[in-house]
């Protein structure tokens, strides 16, 4: 370079030239423009960023701490003594809220130590964690870093931003949610204490095994309330939350143990526990997981997702009452399974335990248990087509190909499985599909037979105190409940409620009213048959007809009072399954007919409704709507449903109820129900058997409880003589134990009941010297007692052959006292005598027939 004067002057001259000046100005202008553009873009970018940020914040939900709760909470069902008996819970709804005073101090400290050790120092956001999370976010290409969120943010994530699981790999959605999460975390921390936030967190956090919150988790893993947990156990639960699947202490105890160790170390480091407490917890490591494993076995056995028949019935009744209260069906079910309701049921745990034990006792059933097969088969053809076969298809195939009497009832389970193998092979061959387990799916269930169900009600309150809907293993929740859902023909139990109750109550009949047990036909000409095989018993009063369950008299009685009256009384007794003109196939069916007296119905009734009807008689004629619960509240104690005073109505007079009770006491002491009698307890009831018999019942009551027991085959196979008595056996054995420690009062006699001596052959006042052998004392509702004298007994010429008043030409007459209407009949020896006379003198005189 030339740095002399001459060189410098030359350089200066060049710089001052016009062309050089223009070039410099142009370059400078370009630089300025570029700088302005950069600044402008930066400003726009910042403005846009601020706008986006403001947009995100503006879309952040406005919340209060009361809004920060888990969405779902299990509904708990309690028995009448306040013990939990069941939970209704949907997925992600098994949460039980508790107060801070019910959570051990070490539980909160364990969560703080493992999840957010600076929880009590930061303002809802831990900036150190954010920096660490940001670094991990960039390093992993957008995957959110573990431990990035504070306890406050996790609470919001699990209660407010519950749809975060749908974000997938959408980074924009994740960033938006994180910004809103952090903003709300700051807001919540401004207005609420750390302990309030921590309590909400511990009641909401997902802790695996479909549990939300520490109370639910404590009960699931340890079988005790969280207030009773040790430091060791608190650390187990706190170690789950980061990844409830990976750190599940039942499925992955080794993974949970590693994180638990970290939790305990941090608790010690932070001064939350002493060295001695730490050492004790560490020493418990093996034992704590052993306890969890052992309890899980017990839990699985006790809570095999089947629930109880009683709990199932409670669910249905609460659901229906919620619908009546204005909820639609979907809303009612959601509220029941995730609304955190508290249901106070009427179940008496002691009585229910007795019922369960007796139904599980093999000695209460015939020795040779039979099995009913329920089978479904799906065969997958080579082209992927699914071919479905039901148990009905199976039964049809066997009847057509092997056994016309095939009915899905087997003497052993082995026989049932053999039949399944035979049928499956035949169907596979029919479709040309290889007999390979990959080519078919099947469902096989077997239930012991005959089946049975029983309901027990406290008649004075309408409380259903116990219920069982079947014997054997319950297959699942809300499966067939024979106590509430199975409609079976009630047989002779209906004689009382359909025929005699209305007759005594409003048709002028009394227990002394007599009918002739003699041949009688229904209106269509079909003979009415008595349950005993041959003969008739002649004149019988209603008391003896109830005691001995006489079919003909029950039908004659309802014919006189009209089936319509009987039907109307049944509706008032609470039966909801009756029909009055319904199309079944091509026929119009109605239960308003003479066979109503014998339980001849279109569909049948349930043990639940039959129990309630008999309970009305036991309760002095007052029907109390049967109830399975008294109150339903939300988790805060607000009453949702109040069932403490269910509707009642007077179905029959108090005097009518007593008369029926008196007659049904005879059933137990000297009639068809003698097998149910026990001790000195007053019992009234009625047996019921249907044609076949396919159904066997006993419905009865004491001064305390009413119960109905049904026995039969699920597919209506006839009961044998040993099986026919199961209902009475179960009724007696259950009710005897239920009443063991109770006094033995008699049924009270209400005012308006009087006793009058009557003639059993006429139901009227006896005539001295004529009715002496037929006089007995009967109860009457005052005003219904007889005022006329006997018109059956007769003094004069008697037929020696049949004991009736002799007709004029009876060859066997003598002078004496007879009972019976009409005169002697032309049968047997009489006809032989008449024929001999016809041969001798050509004369013939017919005897009158008795009525």
Where are these regions (language model features)?
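N-terminal type II signal-anchor transmembrane helix
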Residues: 2-80, 85, 138
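A penicillin-recognizing enzyme superfamily signal
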Residues: 345-366, 371-375, 379-387, 391-446, ...
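Non-catalytic structural connector segments
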Residues: 275-406
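Active-site SXXK
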Residues: 109-112, 267, 355, 461-462, ...
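Conserved catalytic neighborhood of penicillin-recognizing serine enzymes
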Residues: 140-162, 295-303, 508-566, 593, ...
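Mid-domain, small-residue-enriched loop/turn segments at the edges of structured enzyme/sensor domains
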Residues: 526-531, 562-610
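Short, well-structured active-site flanking segments
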Residues: 120-130, 212-214, 274-277, 494, ...
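Peptidoglycan glycan-strand catalytic modules in the bacterial/periplasmic cell-wall system
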Residues: 2-8, 72, 79-279, 288, ...
């Amino acid at each position: 370079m030339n740095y002399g004067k001459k060189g410098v002057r030359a350089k200066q001259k060049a710089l001052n030239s016009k062309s050089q000046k223009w070039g410099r100005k142009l370059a400078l202008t370009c630089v300025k423009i570029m700088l302005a553009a950069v600044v402008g873009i930066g400003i726009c970018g910042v403005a846009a960023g601020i706008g986006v940020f403001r947009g995100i914040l503006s879309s952040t939900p406005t919340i209060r701490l009361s809004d920060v709760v888990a969405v779902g909470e299990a509904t708990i069902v309690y028995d009448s003594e306040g013990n939990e008996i069941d939970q209704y819970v949907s997925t992600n709804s098994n949460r039980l809220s508790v107060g801070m005073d019910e959570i051990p101090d070490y539980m909160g400290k364990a969560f703080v130590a493992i999840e957010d050790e600076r929880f009590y120092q930061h303002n809802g956001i831990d900036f150190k964690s954010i920096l660490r999370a940001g670094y991990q976010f960039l390093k992993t290409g957008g995957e959110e870093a573990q431990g990035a969120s504070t306890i406050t943010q996790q609470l919001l994530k699990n209660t407010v931003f519950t749809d975060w699981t749908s974000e997938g790999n959408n980074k924009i959605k994740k960033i938006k949610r994180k910004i809103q999460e952090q903003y709300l975390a700051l807001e919540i921390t401004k207005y609420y204490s750390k302990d309030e936030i921590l309590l909400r967190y511990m009641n909401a956090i997902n802790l695996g095994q479909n549990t939300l919150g520490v109370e639910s988790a404590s009960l699931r893993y340890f079988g005790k309330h969280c207030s009773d947990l040790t430091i060791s156990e608190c650390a187990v639960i706190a170690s789950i939350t980061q990844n409830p699947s990976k750190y599940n202490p039942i499925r992955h105890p080794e993974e949970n143990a590693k994180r638990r160790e970290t939790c305990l170390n941090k608790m010690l480091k932070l001064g939350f526990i002493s060295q001695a407490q730490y050492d004790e917890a560490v020493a418990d490591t093996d034992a704590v997981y052993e306890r969890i494993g052992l309890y899980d076995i017990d839990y699985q056995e006790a809570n095999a997702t089947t629930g109880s028949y009683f709990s199932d019935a409670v669910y249905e009744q609460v659901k229906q009452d919620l619908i009546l209260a204005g909820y639609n069906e979907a809303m009612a079910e959601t509220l029941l399974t995730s609304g955190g309701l508290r249901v106070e049921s009427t179940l008496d745990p002691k009585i229910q335990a007795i019922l369960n034990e007796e139904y599980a006792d093999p000695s209460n059933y015939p020795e040779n248990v039979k099995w009913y097969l329920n089978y479904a088969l799906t065969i997958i053809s080579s082209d992927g087509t699914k071919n479905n076969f039901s148990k009905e298809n199976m039964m049809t195939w066997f009847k057509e190909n092997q056994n016309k009497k095939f009915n899905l009832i087997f003497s052993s389970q082995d026989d049932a499985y053999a039949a399944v193998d035979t049928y499956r092979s035949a169907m596979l061959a029919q479709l040309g599909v290889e007999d390979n387990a990959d080519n078919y799916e099947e469902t096989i269930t077997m239930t012991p037979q005959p089946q049975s169900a029983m309901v027990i009600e406290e008649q004075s309150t309408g409380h259903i105190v116990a219920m069982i809907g079947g014997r054997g293993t319950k297959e699942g929740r809300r499966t067939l409940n024979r106590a509430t859902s199975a409609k079976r023909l009630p047989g002779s139990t209906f004689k009382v409620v359909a025929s005699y109750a209305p007759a005594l109550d409003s048709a002028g009949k009394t227990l002394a009213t007599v009918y002739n047990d003699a041949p009688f036909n229904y209106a269509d000409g079909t003979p009415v048959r008595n349950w005993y095989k041959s003969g008739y018993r002649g004149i019988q009063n209603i008391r003896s007809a109830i005691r001995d369950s006489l079919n003909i008299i029950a039908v004659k009685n309802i014919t006189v009072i009209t089936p319509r009256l009987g039907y109307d009384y049944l509706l008032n007794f609470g039966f909801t399954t009756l029909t009055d003109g319904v199309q079944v196939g091509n026929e119009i069916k109605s239960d308003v007919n003479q066979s109503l007296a014998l339980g001849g119905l279109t569909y049948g009734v349930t043990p639940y409704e039959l129990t309630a009807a008999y309970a009305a008689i036991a309760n002095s004629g007052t029907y109390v709507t049967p109830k399975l619960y008294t109150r339903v509240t939300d988790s805060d104690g607000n009453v949702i449903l109040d069932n403490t005073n269910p509707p009642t109505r007077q179905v029959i007079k108090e005097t009518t109820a007593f008369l029926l009770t008196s007659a049904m006491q005879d059933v137990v002491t000297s009639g068809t129900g003698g097998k149910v009698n026990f001790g000195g307890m007053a019992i009234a009831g009625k047996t019921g058997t249907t044609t076949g018999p396919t159904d066997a019942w006993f419905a009865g009551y004491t001064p305390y409880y009413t119960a109905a027991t049904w026995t039969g085959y699920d597919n209506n196979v006839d009961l044998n003589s040993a099986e026919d008595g199961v209902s009475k056996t179960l009724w007696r054995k259950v009710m005897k134990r239920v009443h063991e420690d109770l006094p033995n009062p008699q049924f009270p006699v209400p005012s308006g009941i009087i006793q009058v001596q009557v003639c059993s052959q006429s139901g009227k006042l006896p005539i001295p010297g004529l009715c002496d052998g037929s006089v007995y004392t009967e109860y009457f509702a005052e005003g219904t007692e007889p005022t006329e004298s006997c018109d059956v007994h007769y003094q004069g010429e008697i037929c020696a052959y049949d004991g009736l008043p002799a007709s004029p030409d009876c060859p066997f007459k003598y002078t004496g006292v007879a009972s019976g209407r009409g005169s002697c009949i032309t049968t047997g020896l009489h006809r032989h005598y008449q024929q001999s006379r016809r041969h001798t003198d050509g004369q013939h005189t017919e005897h009158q027939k008795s009525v």
